Amino acid sequence: LKPITTEPVLTQPEGKLVTAAWYGKGFYPISGYSRIFSHEMEARATTYVNQGDTAIWIKNSLTEYEGEQGWIRISKVDNKGNWELRTPQAIMVRTNSKNEKKTFYVTKLGGSTPAAVNERGYTVGNNLNIRFRMDSKGVLSQVTTDGSEILGLTDGEGTWYPYGSYGYKYIANEDTPVKKPANLEVTKYVWANTINKQGSETIHTFVNVGYSGNDIYMSCPADTTLYFKGTILGNKVFFKSPQFMGVSKEYNRLLYFSGVRFAWDDNSPGGYKVSFVTGDIIFDYDATSHTLVLPKEYAIVAKVFGHDTYNIYASPSLRIYPFIEKAATPQAPQFWKPERNFRNYTYDERIQKGIAQVQFIISPHDVNGEYINPDSMYYRMYVDDPETPFTFDKIDYPALPKDEMTEIPFWFTDKEYIMGYTNTLRLLFFFTEVQDSIGFQSVYKGGGETRESNIAWYKLPKTTSIQGIHNSNNGSPAKVYYDLLGRRQEGLRKGINLIRKEDGSVEKVIQ
């Protein structure tokens, strides 16, 4: 290749940093380049540098590449709205196992269409430009969206590594986000939202609330790092709608607080219909209890900038009130779709263990239905014996915060063996032998006391036979090796090794 730039630009160029919603399509390899997946993104939060009449600089231009990427220049061509991304441009330097450095480039791919991705039917060339247009509203878009002009990842010899992106569009956002005063003290409030037409089902979450004179700052239920602002006037609180809360790192979106007129409607998608409000959303306010109540004809949504999508975080009958922690007895867990439990028991060659799964719901409510603090909740697992909680350890669960634990925090997940599908639904994989039944118990440590729920038991059907990891299981290895942190390894290595034997015992060996 004959690159336009030979070194990646890793320092942010000078110019105006613009927050934007980013659209695009692309593809990326998996399983050692044996397969290629395509993807499409809509309204992803990003930033770019605008240098006015000369250039725009974008970063992370290869949408699904996870390593650090340099800034890429899009140059202005004329005063008629034409811009172009000239390639090849250096985007990164990587060091291989031999400590050799290699420069990679973004290069226009030509000679094919996305249909040929799996055959890698693209060609790579020099001085190939990808065309862009800037409209009167400042929206920067790639001219072609069909994949005939693709930005790909190549090395200096022109070899294509199967990453590619196309259909770029950047929608600038000029709004200033609401900022909570730096020293403002906030307290925990309950956001209690009725979610069905009958008013019989309420979900709860926490938001942070702070007061500065007559101003009230409240965190977004979707992301408590973002805030919206209201003004207290007598027994009312006025919230401007819409107002920009900022970029949610959790969802990678630009979010707005918005009010909507809301009505249940069985003939509409989702069973309701909404219309967005421009102006003020007015809450009733009790200054004594510091409770806010939303009138029934309104709802609160988190609206995604640059897109039609939104999430409803308050349908009618929303109440927001201070949380006061007190001692409480939690509800017992519930097994979710128990017919699925244990049925996927297999011997996993990758981790060299027998493995089974169980799904259950742990609710942050006490036995009277009152919301309790999930940050103060834990659960225990029992195997056959109601007197002895199961001990989780780092050998089977390497991501545990402690070497051994009998109580798992409500929010803990390692995204592999202990997973949270929702705020309350848990999927847990385990590697121990179960003869008769398995149980779960909720524990709440609040108000200066520790209280436990009843144990919820799931009894294995008589037709189910769960063999534990102590069995050789069709010739599986009798010994499994770990390092001191509980990470699996192939055989003995220099240093301290842990060996789990076929009988379940663990031996420490120093090599």
List each model region and its residues.
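Predominantly extracellular/secreted and cell-surface proteins with exposed
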Residues: 41-124, 209-274
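C-terminal tail/sorting-segment detector
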Residues: 498-511
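Edge beta-strand at a domain terminus
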Residues: 1-19, 39-43, 144-193, 201-205, ...
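Residue-level detector of functionally pivotal "anchor" positions at catalytic/ligand-binding pockets or at interdomain
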Residues: 328-342, 449-485
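Beta-strand-rich modules
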Residues: 430-448
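Solvent-exposed loop/turn segments flanking beta-strands in beta-repeat/beta-sandwich domains
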Residues: 352-405
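Aromatic sugar-binding surface patches on proteins
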Residues: 274-276, 402-426
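Terminal processing/anchoring signals of secreted or surface-associated proteins
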Residues: 58, 218, 464-469, 485-487, ...
